[in-house]
Amino acid sequence: MTERELMARLQREGFAHTYVWQDDPNTEYGEHTHGMETAHIVVSGELTLTMNGNSHTYGPGDRCDVPANAVHSARMGPRGCRYIIGER
């Protein structure tokens, strides 16, 4: 699927705000929360998400969803990461 198709899919699921985000290699986001539910679909590279003490690495085509107000952290892979974000 193209980035546009992935964004449209998230919008059909009720994610009113969708956009493409790209992080540099090895970018880290320490523990934080969002006031809304977020969905992330990896387009290229990889992203490791840690939530509730569990870490999982996502690659191209993978999706991870983070509930509103869930404490989590993220680390990008050695090639960075490009991903679609949906917020609702």
Annotated model-derived regions:
Residues 68-88:
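Ligand-binding loop in jelly-roll beta-barrel domains
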